[in-house]
Design a protein with these regions (language model features):
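Active-site beta-strand->loop->alpha-helix modules in alpha/beta enzyme cores, enriched
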Residues: 2-179, 214-221, 231-245, 252
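A generic structural signal for solvent-exposed, polar alpha-helical segments
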Residues: 15, 29, 184-186, 226
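Short, acidic Gly/Pro/Ser/Thr-rich loop/turn segments
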Residues: 81, 185-187, 210
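A conserved mid-domain beta-alpha-beta active-site/ligand-binding segment of alpha/beta enzyme cores
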Residues: 189-229
Length: 254
């Protein structure tokens, strides 16, 4: 391993993360402007993997759906690479599981009638298909007020590549684009200079939206609970990690 800002871990996502209590105590929340959702009539939300859209933007999706906004979710990959060393679940079984989990989660958000577009790009290799992803997202933006995608600085290869492709698609169609972090809450610290806080905006969640988001996150059983006792079947998002995504606010970069 090479020395890094994360105490010797070459991969910040594998390093011990920032506690949610530290984020909750951060005084910087008060300085973030709010991102308005009231003018959005059609939104396209990009997820590098099934569950990203709920973890990073699920509360906002619940509020948008409740207001009558038309929702399209673009799953860039099917998430088949989440447990490559599992002795219990194959990649094809994960595709089936995670696709069903997405539909169940959207129903919990009150967005059961959302359109879900699966691009079927290979998991862990989105960077090799950025041109294709951008080209396939662009026509989906016809009539959309907003495109939302994973943050391009999230320190996760698929998230960053999906975000870059979305930014390109948005630019080509002149569609406003917001980017949501997922793993940033793990590897960054409050006020972290690696994070573009000047571009950040806050989305306060109503109590109903937060309740819906909690229920939606709970539908991703393949990610939040162990598939079995072996190390290759461990939960991808254990409770201390999920805590970052179950707070009463979400953040986007604009």
């Amino acid at each position: 391993m090479t020395d890094t800002l994360d105490g010797g871990y070459a991969d910040p996502i594998q390093a011990p993360g920032t506690l949610e209590a530290d984020w909750q105590a951060w005084q910087g929340w008060a300085g973030l402007p709010e991102a308005a959702l009231d003018a959005v009539t059609r939104v396209v939300v990009v997820a590098a993997h099934p569950d990203d859209e709920v973890l990073g933007f699920g509360g906002a999706l619940a509020m948008l759906a409740a207001s009558g906004t038309e929702v399209t979710v673009v799953a860039v990959t099917d998430g088949e690479g989440s447990h490559p060393d599992s002795d219990l679940v194959t990649a094809s079984e994960l595709v089936r599981l995670r696709t069903a989990e997405t539909r169940a989660a959207l129903a919990e958000l009150g967005a059961a009638d959302s359109t879900v577009v699966r691009l079927r790009i290979p998991d862990t290799r989105v960077d090799r298909f950025e041109d294709e992803v951008a080209a396939r997202i662009a026509p989906l933006l016809d009539g959309a007020d907003l495109l939302v995608a994973p943050w391009t600085g999230d320190v996760h290869g698929d998230h960053e590549a999906a975000g870059r492709a979305a930014v390109r698609a948005a630019a080509s169609t002149r569609t406003p684009c917001w980017l949501y972090p997922v793993w940033m809450w793990h590897w960054a610290a409050p006020g972290d200079p690696r994070v573009p806080w000047r571009r950040a905006a806050l989305i306060p969640l109503s109590s109903t939206a937060l309740e819906r988001k909690r229920a939606a996150v709970g539908r991703f059983v393949s990610q939040i609970a162990p598939l079995g006792p072996g190390p290759g079947d461990a939960a991808i998002l254990p409770p201390h990690e999920l805590a970052h995504h179950l707070r009463d606010r979400e953040v986007v970069f604009r």
